[in-house]
From Swiss-Prot:
Its main location: cytoplasm. Destroys radicals which are normally produced within the cells and which are toxic to biological systems. Its EC number is 1.15.1.1. This is Superoxide dismutase [Cu-Zn]. Homodimer. The lineage of its organism: Eukaryota, Viridiplantae, Streptophyta, Embryophyta, Tracheophyta. Cu cation binds at H45, H47, H62, H119. One of its GO terms (cellular component) is cytoplasm. It comes from Panax ginseng. Keywords: Antioxidant, Copper, Cytoplasm, Disulfide bond, Metal-binding, Oxidoreductase, Zinc.
Length: 152
């Protein structure tokens, strides 16, 4: 089994820890806990770069090795890094588990060394009709991010 971890930090006290696990050629399981967010839905994506030298702005676009349009996690046409939304409760926290086969930790297309980003607004899953729907899901600003690193 391969494991990875991301420690998220950002503006306004947003923080969290995300764990990734993958068994051989199986899907990747993502578990996380976030805090300091406004209640509601927040876009949650793997971005192409692990560079946080300019905060979350330097993490690049959504991870998209197949050069597809933005979509929902269950859509055939989507960026590999499109993980949809996390639901934040009234207390400002979110706990979640996502299982996804497009974000491997091993082999071709590994997400190790890339970044996770939590956005200010809901991801419209490419279906909102906004000019940004097909590229970013119109998910708004980048509130918190972190580098995806290999874990022992």
């Amino acid at each position: 089994m391969v494991k990875a971890v991301t420690v998220l930090s950002g503006s306004g006290g947003v923080s969290g820890v995300i764990h990734f696990t993958q068994e051989e050629d199986g899907p990747t399981t993502v578990t996380g806990k976030l805090s300091g967010l406004a209640p509601g839905l927040h876009g949650f994506h793997v971005h192409a770069l692990g560079d946080t030298t300019n905060g979350c702005l330097s993490t690049g676009p959504h991870y998209n090795p197949a050069n597809k349009e933005h979509g929902a996690p269950e859509d055939e046409t989507r960026h590999a890094g499109d993980l949809g939304n996390v639901t934040v409760g009234e207390d400002g926290t979110a706990e979640f588990t996502i299982v996804d086969k497009q974000i491997p930790l091993i082999g071709s297309g590994s997400i190790i060394g890339r970044a996770v980003v939590v956005h200010a607004d809901p991801d419209d899953l490419g279906k909102g009709g906004h000019e940004l729907s097909k590229s970013t899901g119109n998910a708004g600003g980048r509130l918190a991010c972190g580098f995806i690193g290999l874990q022992g």
